[in-house]
């Protein structure tokens, strides 16, 4: 997957393709997308959203939600050891009371952007729930699945994460 038609640059938003059920997380296109996104946008577990010129002056840090999208891709592809390692890195970015920012500096880990950021917290909770379910054998690693539907199905069945 690429950022846009005719653009070869990576965009972390393409990690959402499996999350919406378009392709399975272990499909070759999904796996290749993870490889390309990591190669072009990752710095020690932190992902920039994209690095192409968008016309906005100044730079941005790595977006925590993007790193959690990566964690979800690893989890749903059955790469649980890698997912665990990434989660350990991401958990270090919370402050002394466990709050997370929108972004982080890839060198220092310093919180950047909106703080606290609800999207980062939502992604943290969902990623931990998916990883826990995967470790308990409650997520199938074959076939496409809308991650949100999985969560709703579990709640309706009385099996919250």
Predicted regions and their residues:
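Extended glycan-interaction surfaces of carbohydrate-active proteins
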Residues: 1-63, 85-116, 122-136, 140-161
């Amino acid at each position: 997957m690429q950022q846009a038609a005719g653009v070869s640059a990576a965009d972390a938003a393409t990690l959402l393709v499996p999350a919406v059920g378009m392709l399975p997380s272990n499909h070759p296109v999904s796996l290749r997308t993870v490889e390309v996104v990591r190669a072009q946008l990752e710095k020690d577990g932190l992902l920039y959203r994209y690095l192409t010129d968008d016309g906005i002056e100044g730079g941005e840090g790595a977006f925590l939600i993007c790193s959690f999208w990566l964690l979800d891709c690893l989890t749903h592809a059955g790469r649980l050891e890698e997912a665990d390692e990434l989660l350990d890195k991401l958990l270090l970015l919370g402050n002394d009371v466990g709050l997370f920012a929108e972004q982080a500096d890839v060198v220092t880990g310093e919180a950047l952007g909106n703080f606290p950021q609800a999207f980062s917290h939502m992604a943290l909770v969902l990623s931990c729930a998916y990883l826990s379910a995967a470790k308990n054998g409650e997520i199938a690693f074959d076939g496409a699945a809308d991650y949100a539907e999985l969560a709703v199905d579990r709640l309706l069945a009385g099996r919250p994460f």
